[in-house]
Amino acid sequence: NIEGAEFINVDLTSSSFADSHLTEVKFDGCDLTSVDFTRASIIECSFNESVLNGTDFSYSKTDYCNFSDADLAGAIFQGADLTNSDFSAAENLNACRFDEETIWPDNEYLPEDFDSNYASDLSSLQDEDDYQQSDY
């Protein structure tokens, strides 16, 4: 269990917090690339301005967490419960991985351009209309 700790501008790349209980922990301005938070209970924590590329939150419970200006490209949220967490100012949430079991917060806590609907069948995807074929 970790409660009330502050990690400010710390490089925690590839660390493991799997199966841990984190309460009111600040991970602000940190490099959390490839950190393992699988099955963790993460309550009232902040990830403001942190890099979370490839960070694994699979099957975790994040409740009342703040991801303002956090870079979530490649983050994994499969089977995660993200109820009440705030992703509204997060970056690259469209580049994360999730599945039909992921529980997202209400739309007011998500970026306007984010689609939380999981599509396991990609056959319905189409190219954008303004696509132009190159001569090369």
Describe the function of each predicted region.
Residues 1-136:
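Tandem repeat scaffolds
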